[in-house]
Amino acid sequence: MQLVILRVTIFLPWCFAVPVPPAADHKGWDFVEGYFHQFFLTKKESPLLTQETQTQLLQQFHRNGTDLLDMQMHALLHQPHCGVPDGSDTSISPGRCKWNKHTLTYRIINYPHDMKPSAVKDSIYNAVSIWSNVTPLIFQQVQNGDADIKVSFWQWAHEDGWPFDGPGGILGHAFLPNSGNPGVVHFDKNEHWSASDTGYNLFLVATHEIGHSLGLQHSGNQSSIMYPTYWYHDPRTFQLSADDIQRIQHLYGEKCSSDIP
């Protein structure tokens, strides 16, 4: 099973990614160990804090490879973030994990308790538009039947093998284009979702998760929407970073004037 998760997702370099069950809420090194087991797929019996795995973690959060796992790093690890395990490569996916077409349908299957359906629809529309604005991709919403990208809200265990963990943990996850469930995007229904700066802004998290569903890995650039942890940006002024644009255009190409309606 291939998947991408946002604690608000993480991909292996060959575009294989699966979400991981939540870790216990430990402090200090116990938490770091749990984090590594979750997001770097280390074996329980293997040495944990090897130089290689520590370097991976530091690179994931765009920090100098000589830094120590200090209080600032511990704080970063406790931020709500994507729950998909990451490999050592956070650059452009060498496998070019992508859809083989430019017109994609999407469907919102259900809604959270704390947002009006119209606000959810606007947030998802704006999220897909962020990606279509810089690529030849065209997104069309459908109300019924199958769709390429399927958006839904769930809580705890929800029959995909990757349960959510309640408020403040994993915010969402998404399956990759070449997975057994391409385009599936799940959000944790236990989170407080909004169209503003209260709780978690659905537009921002959806932009991240849909990026994964299009084939993007996480970025180590903190200005990127594909950065592993959730950071609030004003949706009214939000723009993709140069890193985001470069990587999505690497998969789908640039938007030509003929692509503009």
Curated annotation (Swiss-Prot):
Q: How is the cofactor bound?
A: Binds 1 zinc ion per subunit.
Question: Any keyword Signal?
Answer: yes
Gene3D superfamilies in the cross-refs:
Collagenase (Catalytic Domain) (3.40.390.10)
Which SUPFAM superfamilies does the entry link to? Metalloproteases ('zincins'), catalytic domain
State the GO CC annotations: extracellular matrix; extracellular space
Is Cell membrane among this UniProt entry's keywords? Answer: no
Alphabetized Pfam families for the sequence:
Peptidase_M10 (PF00413)
Name of the protein described by the UniProt record? Matrix metalloproteinase-26
Taxonomy of origin reads: Eukaryota, Metazoa, Chordata, Craniata, Vertebrata
